[in-house]
UniProtKB/Swiss-Prot annotation:
This is Scolopendra 5971.33 Da toxin. One of its GO terms (molecular function) is toxin activity. The keyword Secreted applies. It comes from the Eukaryota. GO terms for cellular component: extracellular region.
């Protein structure tokens, strides 16, 4: 299930991805 995971590190934003 999706909660806040996609919001914390959106795939559309590589800058947020560690």
């Amino acid at each position: 299930e999706i909660t806040v995971e996609p919001v914390r590190h959106p795939k559309k934003d590589p800058s947020e991805a560690e």
